[in-house]
Amino acid sequence: MWKDEYLRWMNEPTLDLELKKDLLNKTEKELEEIFYGPLTFGTGGIRGILGAGINRLNIYTIRKANDGLARYLLKTKGDIAKLQGVVIAHDNRRMSKEFALESAKVLGAYGIKSFLFEDLRPTPELSFATRYLKAAAGIVITASHNPPNYNGYKIYDEFGCQFTPQFADVIVSMVNEVTDLFQIKTVSKEVLIEKHLLTYIGQEIDELYLNEVKSIQINPQVKKDIKIVFTPLHGTSAELGLSLLESTGYLVYPVLEQMVHDSSFSTVKSPNPENASAFEMAIALGKKVDADLLIATDPDADRLGVAVKQGNDYVLLTGNQTGAILINYILSERKKQGTLPENGVVFNTIVTSDLGAKIARAYGFNVIQTLTGFKYIGEQIRYLENTNQEFIFGYEESYGYVIKGFVRDKDSLQALLLASEAAAYYQHYENKTLLEKLNDIYETYGVHQEALHNIDLFGIEGAKRIQAIVERFRVNPLTSINHQNVMVFEDYLYSYRIEKGYKTALSFDKTNAVKYILENGSWFVLRPSGTEPKLKIYIGVTGKTVESARIELDSIGQAILALVDQIK
């Protein structure tokens, strides 16, 4: 019962006083929400609201996660894990720095060394550092682009990739073995330093990482006669992102108000480059300086948003559109230079547009689809190392891209450099913007349009309704929708596909999602978010014109939402 857990916290003599105050200010309903069950690992690790309780992120739940990780590393690697150590980074959020040090204190109690970044750093740099330092694992304290009252905890394997379920599930089971959050052993910072269990890292890793990022350039000597507005949205790319662009010769105008590491993200409604509102200050500056390109990264610098000048205003590209532009640029330019491999591979996910895959296949390359979550792409990049195939590009619709595998997660710094280069190249050689180039791509491969509907459903009742909706689409699959017959149904939880009445097995890991593909090539996916209390509905269509594709997109969306609304 949640009340028993609540009383345990209230009667705990060592409970942090601020957290105790937090509990005293809660209503009974609020207390039930924060004690009904523990935080769980999702597609992006653990994310939760800051505060007291087992369903909130605080020093005790952070200790619990690290205790499980420490025991997992010692069980699977033995004492070598102590020498390899764990790399730890954090973002600009409230309690991030404290949680990062708290992680080192728990690991140190098990004799495991920590390499702790001296200040906030981009998540992709954590992936790089874990690989470079040959560490046993990596940790980053971040909630990505979630609201300011959230924080999070992500763990990476020795290859710099987020743990996939077969390993993460073992870690989670070991985390859940912790029954008393107040008895977890820690050691002080002073003891960590005295016993050489804590090493601070920073500038030397920055330089190595940035040199690798610069290696992705295809036409580094292209004339850079474009103006770029850059905003880190108060996050971790402020220093490295600006330095990267300026050191490679671009004229950059940073949004100064958003270069500040503000944990409240006070200048934006949401620090998410997927949202148009996040670009408001960048657009204002862009109009002032007549910029050609606007670039925004999310707070932990793994996602990239791009906006392109059109007339007197700016058009925001979707993640799918940016991905298509980047893959087209990589393949066309490397083909000109004769640097394309014979057996190149491109990765995307089950909710990503078909456009990038069509481009890759037109160049004769294999396209491998993964489940949602960049950890699956990172895992696949590693698998290629023992084959004669070469990684070309990986991306997903949610504004995540990776060009080279020295990082095994999405990397906004790689993406912003290549997007800037593509914009400069097309401007100089074809007198075209990225938006005009996208229209060229549409002419060749067809117009592709996508949409994402987020349905927020909070708390215990919300979680139940999300499950009920997905189950309705799973247990009783539709045979048609929006006057289109269903041609393919895929269930990723029970790992099967039905096409033309024939049932075949899917080889993906299991995840709670279903996909429908219609006779006209349109498709949609329903899945609960792995990091937030919401149901996600992804839709993709193709058409001869942008207008006809958007009409189809809206029509399918309305039909799905009408069905969802009937499920209580």
Where would I find each of the regions flagged by the language model?
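An N-terminal, well-structured beta->alpha segment
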Residues: 4-103, 196-228, 236
